[in-house]
C-alpha cells in the first residue's frame, strides 16, 4: 500500500476515523460515488472524507476506478477490496458523483488509456456531479466540445477568486490550483454555462450548467494544508504562490481556503439532499 510522502500508511477512511470523522456504512442521507483517478488513492480518499464528513448531513461514500487502467502506486488488492469498477456505477444507487483530477492533463484525451470509460460515463451520467481539475476538463470536452490548452508555466499556489452571484459560493475567497492546462472563460460562456467564480491570475475556478446539476471546478478546494508543500518538495522547480507565509518554506502554510470549501461543500450537499427528498415527496 502506498501513499504520498508524509502521509501515514492507512486507508483514507482509517485516517479520517482516527481523527474523529465518521461515515455511514450504509443508508446515510446521501450516497456519493467518487471516481478517484489520482495515483495515491489513500490520500485522495482522506481529502474527501475530511471535507464531506464535517457537516450535520450523513454521507455514505464509495470509490470507483476505471477498469482499463493499472495503477502503479496502489496495490491491486487494495483497489479490489476498496473500490468498485466504473461499470458498476449505475447499480450503486448514488445521489451524486465526484470525479477527481488525474495526472494526464498534458496528454490528448484520446491517448489516456481509460478515456473510453470516462467518456462513456460523462455522456451517460444523469446524476448531480462535481468534475474536478482534469475531470472538469474531460467533462467540458465531452459535453460541450471545449478544448483545454497548455499553460506556459504550471499554475501552482493559492489564488484569490471573485464570485458572480449564485447560491453556492459568495464574496471573495482563496483556493488552491495545481495544473498545467486550462479552459478559456470565453469558451465556457459560449457553451451557455454559468461562471460562478474566477480569478485574474488562475482563470475560471468554478462553472456550472444552468440548473446547478453539474459543476466544473478547475482547482482543489479538497486539498489538505500540506498538499502543495509536498508538491513543492517533490518538484523543487516551481514555488507555490501565496502559500507559505512570507514565501518561507520553513513556515507552516495557513489553511486560507478552508472557509471556502466549507461553504461550497455544505451548500452542495444540502442542495442534493433537498432535491432528493423533494423528489421522494413528489412521488408519494
From Swiss-Prot:
<dbReference type="InterPro" id="IPR029062">
    <property type="entry name" value="Class_I_gatase-like"/>
</dbReference>
<keyword id="KW-0963">Cytoplasm</keyword>
<keyword id="KW-0486">Methionine biosynthesis</keyword>
<comment type="pathway">
    <text>Amino-acid biosynthesis; L-methionine biosynthesis via de novo pathway; O-acetyl-L-homoserine from L-homoserine: step 1/1.</text>
</comment>
<dbReference type="GO" id="GO:0009086">
    <property type="term" value="P:methionine biosynthetic process"/>
</dbReference>
<feature type="active site" description="Proton acceptor">
    <location>
        <position position="220"/>
    </location>
</feature>
<dbReference type="GO" id="GO:0005737">
    <property type="term" value="C:cytoplasm"/>
</dbReference>
<keyword id="KW-0012">Acyltransferase</keyword>
<dbReference type="GO" id="GO:0008899">
    <property type="term" value="F:homoserine O-succinyltransferase activity"/>
</dbReference>
<dbReference type="InterPro" id="IPR033752">
    <property type="entry name" value="MetA_family"/>
</dbReference>
<feature type="binding site">
    <location>
        <position position="234"/>
    </location>
    <ligand>
        <name>substrate</name>
    </ligand>
</feature>
<feature type="site" description="Important for substrate specificity">
    <location>
        <position position="178"/>
    </location>
</feature>
<feature type="site" description="Important for acyl-CoA specificity">
    <location>
        <position position="105"/>
    </location>
</feature>
<keyword id="KW-0614">Plasmid</keyword>
<keyword id="KW-0808">Transferase</keyword>
<protein>
    <recommendedName>
        <fullName>Homoserine O-acetyltransferase 2</fullName>
        <ecNumber>2.3.1.31</ecNumber>
    </recommendedName>
</protein>
<keyword id="KW-0028">Amino-acid biosynthesis</keyword>
<feature type="binding site">
    <location>
        <position position="178"/>
    </location>
    <ligand>
        <name>substrate</name>
    </ligand>
</feature>
<dbReference type="GO" id="GO:0004414">
    <property type="term" value="F:homoserine O-acetyltransferase activity"/>
</dbReference>
<comment type="similarity">
    <text>Belongs to the MetA family.</text>
</comment>
<dbReference type="Pfam" id="PF04204">
    <property type="entry name" value="HTS"/>
</dbReference>
<comment type="function">
    <text>Transfers an acetyl group from acetyl-CoA to L-homoserine, forming acetyl-L-homoserine.</text>
</comment>
<feature type="active site">
    <location>
        <position position="222"/>
    </location>
</feature>
<feature type="binding site">
    <location>
        <position position="154"/>
    </location>
    <ligand>
        <name>substrate</name>
    </ligand>
</feature>
<feature type="active site" description="Acyl-thioester intermediate">
    <location>
        <position position="133"/>
    </location>
</feature>
Amino acid at each position: 500500500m502506498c501513499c504520498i510522502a508524509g502521509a501515514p500508511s492507512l486507508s483514507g477512511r482509517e485516517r479520517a476515523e482516527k481523527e474523529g470523522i465518521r461515515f455511514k456504512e450504509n443508508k446515510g442521507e446521501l450516497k456519493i460515488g467518487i471516481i478517484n483517478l489520482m495515483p495515491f488513492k489513500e490520500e485522495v480518499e482522506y481529502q474527501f472524507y475530511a471535507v464531506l464528513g464535517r457537516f450535520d448531513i450523513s454521507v455514505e461514500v464509495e470509490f470507483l476506478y476505471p477498469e482499463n487502467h493499472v495503477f502503479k502506486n496502489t496495490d491491486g488488492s487494495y483497489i479490489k477490496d476498496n473500490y468498485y469498477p466504473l461499470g458498476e456505477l449505475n447499480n450503486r444507487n448514488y445521489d451524486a458523483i465526484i470525479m477527481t483530477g488525474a495526472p494526464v492533463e498534458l496528454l490528448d484525451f484520446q491517448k489516456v488509456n481509460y478515456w473510453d470509460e470516462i467518456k462513456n460515463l460523462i455522456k451517460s451520467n444523469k446524476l448531480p456531479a462535481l468534475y474536478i481539475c482534469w475531470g472538469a476538463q474531460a467533462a467540458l470536452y465531452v459535453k460541450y466540445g471545449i478544448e483545454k490548452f497548455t499553460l506556459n508555466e504550471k499554475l501552482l499556489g493559492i489564488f484569490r477568486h471573485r464570485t458572480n452571484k449564485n447560491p453556492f459560493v459568495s464574496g471573495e475567497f482563496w483556493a488552491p490550483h495545481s495544473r498545467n492546462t486550462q479552459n478559456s472563460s470565453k469558451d465556457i460562456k459560449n457553451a451557455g454555462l454559468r461562471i460562478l467564480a474566477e480569478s485574474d491570475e488562475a482563470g475560471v475556478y468554478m462553472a456550472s450548467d444552468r440548473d446547478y446539476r453539474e459543476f466544473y471546478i478547475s482547482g482543489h478546494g479538497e486539498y489538505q494544508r500540506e498538499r502543495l508543500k509536498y508538491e513543492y518538495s517533490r518538484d523543487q522547480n516551481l514555488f507555490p504562490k501565496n502559500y507559505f507565509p512570507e514565501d518561507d518554506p520553513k513556515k507552516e502554510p495557513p489553511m486560507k481556503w478552508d472557509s471556502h470549501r466549507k461553504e461550497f461543500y455544505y451548500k452542495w450537499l444540502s442542495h442534493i439532499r433537498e432535491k432528493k427528498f423533494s423528489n421522494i415527496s413528489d412521488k408519494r
